[in-house]
Amino acid sequence: MSAAPVYQLNDLLYLMARLRHPDGGCPWDLQQDFASIVPHTLEEAYEVADAIEREDFAHLPSELGDLLFQVVYYSQLGQEQQLFDFSTVVHSITAK
């Protein structure tokens, strides 16, 4: 039996790039834009808050991951439109 893979941030960035790739990406993901994923972002943020309020710390990492996925999604959209990328987001928060 082999150990489960340990994923890193670059794996998530790669996954999003694959989902949004014009050739062979996910049809649903390819249709999305900044505005269309806002409801999903809000839902994920509420799920993080709910897990914290319920002190469900076993489930919190999964909910935080879902919220991080939203940030990665926006970053991919920004990169595609040559507005910004994930590194810009990280630099922005770190420089604050």
Spell out what each predicted region is.
Residues M1-L60:
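Extended low-complexity intrinsically disordered regions
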Residues L83:
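Compact nucleic-acid interaction/catalytic patches
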Residues T41-A49, F57-Q79, S87-T94:
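An amphipathic alpha-helical micro-motif enriched in hydrophobic residues
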